[in-house]
């Protein structure tokens, strides 16, 4: 039961993991891609991505990003990783690009070594593994901290046109009214092996999702409090915008403002997790604001 709970319900709830044993796999050929369109194509790109992505093979993972990055014009990108050759990847991407109907302003498809691909996906393009650390973690680390606030949700079906338009408008509003911060929506593809595992086989209950959505805002240390307040208000408004179309939340994107977080994170697995908590940590030693409780009583 403890092993079941730690696969999707861990996160400091039951104890401290002291070691891991990995079943390593051969490293496959890896191809990366980045597609970017002019912002006026954003609604078409997101709508088509939501329809195209579930048709792709397990070897392809992608995300769709609608982001404001401090300029008056937001960005719309689709990026991803493919376990296979660039020529095969290009063939998978071509129908999607054609259906969008607007020529991308960036269309990169290329092979990459696995380690470098993971550095790029981890936000460390151009850095070594050593440099991809905070200086407090490694003296040669070059990363710096930034402040952010984030929320998450899941969708189990493509958004209707009205929902797509609402999110595109929300990013435009962020760029117009709070241009000093970065932020927006990132859709991460699910499906494949994730969804073939039953919802109760592990503590991770989100097994029917089409995509996970992370929506966030970030700012620098010297950002005025009034700007930060505007950014967090935008985030709260984005949650309202998504509410008709999305449900749940990803427990690794812990959200201190999330209401009904127990159900959002754990769904139908919550009662079993509480039972495991009561058995392994009856005194609630591993306690934090959103830790699994020892009882479901109010």
Region roles according to the model:
Residues 1-298:
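Soluble FAD-dependent oxygen oxidases
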């Amino acid at each position: 039961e403890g092993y079941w709970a730690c696969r999707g319900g861990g996160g400091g709830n039951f104890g401290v993991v002291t070691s891991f044993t990995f079943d390593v796999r051969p490293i496959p050929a890896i191809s990366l891609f980045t597609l970017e369109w002019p912002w006026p194509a954003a609604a078409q790109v997101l709508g088509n991505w939501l329809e195209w992505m579930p048709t792709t093979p397990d070897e392809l993972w992608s995300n769709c990003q609608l982001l404001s990055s401090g300029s008056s014009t937001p960005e719309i990108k689709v990026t991803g990783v493919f376990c296979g050759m660039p020529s095969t990847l290009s063939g998978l991407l071509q129908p999607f690009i054609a259906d969008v109907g607007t020529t991308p302003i960036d269309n990169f498809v290329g092979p990459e070594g696995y380690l470098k691909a993971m550095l790029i996906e981890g936000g460390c393009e151009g850095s070594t593994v050593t440099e991809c650390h905070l200086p407090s973690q490694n003296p040669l680390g070059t990363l710096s901290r930034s402040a952010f606030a984030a929320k998450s949700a899941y969708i189990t079906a493509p958004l209707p046109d009205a929902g797509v338009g609402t999110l595109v408008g929300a990013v435009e509003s962020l760029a117009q009214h709070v241009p000093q911060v970065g932020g927006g929506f990132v859709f991460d593809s699910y499906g494949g092996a994730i969804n073939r595992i039953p919802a109760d086989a592990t503590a991770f209950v989100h097994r029917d999702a089409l995509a996970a959505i992370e929506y966030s805002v970030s700012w620098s240390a010297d950002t005025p409090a009034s700007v930060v307040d505007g950014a967090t208000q935008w985030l709260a408004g984005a949650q309202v915008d998504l509410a008709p179309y999305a449900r749940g939340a990803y427990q690794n994107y812990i959200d201190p403002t999330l209401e009904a977080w127990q159900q959002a994170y754990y769904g139908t697995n919550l009662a079993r997790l509480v039972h495991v908590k009561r058995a392994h940590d009856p005194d609630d030693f591993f306690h934090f604001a959103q830790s699994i409780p020892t009882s479901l009583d109010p």
